[in-house]
Amino acid sequence: MSAPTRKSPPTTLSLRHAFEVEQARREAERYAREEADRRQQEEDLSRAEQLYDALIGDPVFLAAHNLTVDWRRYSVHLESPDFRIRTYFEAGIATITVGDKRNVAVSATPAPLKSEQADSVPEALRIVASFLADEIP
């Protein structure tokens, strides 16, 4: 019984063959990058949703402190008339900022006062709670 034959590269050098191999390699790399980006975006979106769910979990607490929660794709905002705590998820990292709305005369967006980063939703929630404790005595 003979071994299966493998298709071997052409015995003569061919620009066409080399070009087609290179094009296929680049296409495979592009597809792998796009898939990795898509998976990362899905993970970031899921983390934003988890944080949002944690923040809206106690509507009585939110109402007692005049807080609202908003979720926009990769960012979650915890707001009061005086400040905004924003958490933005990108590339597996949560960036949490707090901005003061009391002295916003020029811009509709409060300037960030503090910023921290977190690697997980529980850590992001802890930082949000810390910023909130700084703003609400």
Residue ranges and their predicted role:
Residues 1-35:
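Charged, low-complexity eukaryotic segments
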Residues 10, 39, 43-46, 50, ...:
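Alpha-helix boundary/N-cap detector
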Residues 22-66:
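Contiguous, amphipathic alpha-helical segments that mediate oligomerization or scaffolding
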Residues 53, 57-100:
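Amphipathic, interaction-prone secondary-structure segments
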Residues 82-124, 134-137:
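Intrinsically disordered, low-complexity regulatory segments enriched in Ser/Thr/Pro
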Residues 127-130:
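C-terminal partner/receptor-binding element of secreted or periplasmic proteins
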